[in-house]
Regions:
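Short polar/charged helix/loop
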Residues: 1-108
Length: 108
């Protein structure tokens, strides 16, 4: 089982959608928002996680310098235009990606 930290702006829609999809296939996942997570909390979660997945390419620049590049991944779903974590368009992006990671035993 891999441990995932998923991050979007608020930690309520895009990152939650990915975290739920990962949990659905037996992985551990915690969703956070960069706007509402204190730096010390974020560092603690990064230390716990095998992978830190940001939901938009521009969020890579928000990562503290000490986040290992080996943990950082991008699943760019764009700006939050979805409004809720189970939005059909968002799920058509997230679920196939999780399925592809599962085929690789979550070595992403």
């Amino acid at each position: 089982m891999a441990k995932f930290l998923t991050m979007c702006a608020g930690g309520n829609v895009r990152s939650v959608s990915l975290a739920w999809a990962l949990k659905d296939v037996g992985q551990e996942a915690i969703a956070v928002g960069h706007l509402y997570t204190r730096p010390e909390t974020f560092r603690l979660l990064v230390a716990w996680a095998d992978y830190v997945i940001v939901m938009q390419e521009s969020m890579v620049a928000l990562m503290p310098a000490d986040v290992p590049e080996s943990k950082l991944r991008v699943l760019d779903v764009g700006e939050d235009r979805f409004g809720y974590a189970t939005h059909p368009e968002l799920l058509t992006i997230v679920r196939p990606m999780v399925a592809s990671w599962m085929r690789r035993d979550f070595k992403i």
